[in-house]
Structure formats: C-alpha cells, structure tokens
Amino acid sequence: DLLPYCEAIVSVWNLLGRRDNKYKARIKITVHEHGIDDIRARVEERFARIRPLFTGVDQALLAEITQAFAPPAYAETSLAAYDAARAANPAFRSWSDTNLSAHKNPDYAIVSVSLKKQGATPGDASADQMRVLADLAERFGHDELRISHEQNVILPHVAKGDLPDVYQALRAADLATANIGLISDIIACPGMDYCALATARSIPIAQQIAVRFDALKLEHDVGPLKIKISGCINACGHHHVGHIGILGLDRAGVENYQVTLGGDGTEDAAIGERAGPGFSAEEILPAVERLVLGYLDLRSDPEETFLQAFRRLGMEPFKAVLYPDKEDKRDAA
C-alpha cells in the first residue's frame, strides 16, 4: 500500500499546490491553506481509486537498481595498522572516534569526511579537495563516495587497515576535522548570501557558532548536538528537526532569528518547539552559548545528551537560560 499511497499524496499536491508564487510552492503550504482534514480526505479518495490499479513494482527495474547498489567485493584485511595508529596518534584516535561509523563488515568502516572546519562555509570543498576525495574513493573506497544531507562526504566502504593512510591524505588536504555529530557539524542553507528566497543569513551564523565553541574547547564535552539553520520558512536547513533549530526571518527589514528546541530527524522524530521571541544577528550567538552552557549544568550526568536532557526536563529550564532577563524580572516581581 505504501507506494500507491505516496502517489496519492503527490497527486493531491500536484492538483492543489501553488504555482502562482514560488515562495509558496511547498506541500506544507498546501496543507496549511487547505487544512489537514481536507488533504487527508482527498488523499484517501485518490488512494481508493488508484490502489486497485497497482500490481507491484517492476521487478526487472528493481533488480537493475539492486545490482547498481550491490556491495563491493570485500577483501580480507589486517587491523594491525589501524590499531597501532589509534594507540600512537591521539589526533587519529579522536578523528576515528567521531568520523567513523560501524560497517556491516567488521574489517571495514564508513568514513564521514567533515566539510565543517570551524570558521569555513558549511558543506564547501575546493576543487583540489574534491580531487583528493575522488582519488581516495578510487584508491581505498571501491570507487564510491556519497554526499550526505548533512553536507558532508561519505566513503562507505573503507578497509580499517587503510584508515591511517586515508586520514593522512585527508589531513594533508585540510579535510580531517574531527567533529561529525558535534556542535560545529552544523547544517546551514546558503541563506541570504546566495539564495534569492532567503530572508536572513545562515552561513555567518554557523561560522560564528563553530568558531566560538572551538575556542571554548567544549565540543567533545557537550557531545552529540545537531544545530540546523534555515534562512527562510522553506526550511532547507532542516531547522525544525534540529536539537537546536535556528530560523532566520525578516522583521521590518532586520534579520531576526527564531530558536526551536527538541527537534529530531531520526526514528524518534519530533518537530522542535519554538522557545520564544527571536534574536537579532548580534544576539543569536550569545543565545546559543547560553543554551549549551545551561545544558551542561542541567544534564543529569556527562552521558545525557542535549536532546535527552530536553526530553526529560521540558522547555522551561532551557527557556530560563535562553531568556535570563525575563527570569530576572520575574524574580524581582
């Protein structure tokens, strides 16, 4: 039922979606304008008509796609070089702790190459760096690399024995930033610097946050924290599912940044809750710093992540650190 139901949703959106205004050519705008009940009724009616006509996916096409994504031929590999590098090189150990993910073959790893060096434009790579990545994919990655929605590059099949060489090549190309999943691994849309739809800048905000927390040397102490920044309501930066989401808006010609908390884009999906009034471009970095430092005080132990603490405590303790002036006025009253 899933595929025809998805087709029904797309068909209804195609029928009702706005074509007169590029700013409103989004399914969420259609749902907002027509209401979820009307959209649901239309989808169910369309699904009832097309479901009997669906006889299943084209098996030949499915087999062709499956073959295109077949796993490579894994070679047996020694882990000695990897284990020795972890023992002898703290920088390699830190990188492997953050930038490697488990592979279904225990002798291999999934390498996430961070394009989020502190102070750089999130997701940017130079032509020379792209050539290095292509060479690494050819030499060590079975000719495969992927671009993640988190604006990083993935080498999905790297033998652990080759990881020290991969790391050294990445380091030489200034691509060995060890921050995957940490504060400075920020998703940010192009914002007003490059996008005609944007109402606020995103890239400078991401750069300021990354530089600040690198200077504070708190990233690894804070642990997993997803900050996502969008420069307009189209939400290309996925701010609504950030642990800390930042939405840039235009308030009477002045950039204003709305903060949401508690979003999650994983299997425990949640839309972030708006914390309160927005902040100016000058205020948003101190606001994020207050949030993160407040979390360190609020968490039950060093293992409790920002998202876990938010789910345990709710919005109010975080709002108190985000808006200290309001709390001071409340105490004075």
Q: Which residues does each PLM region occupy?
A:
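Peripheral terminal and linker regions in Fe-S/redox and tRNA-modifying enzymes
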Residues: 1-333
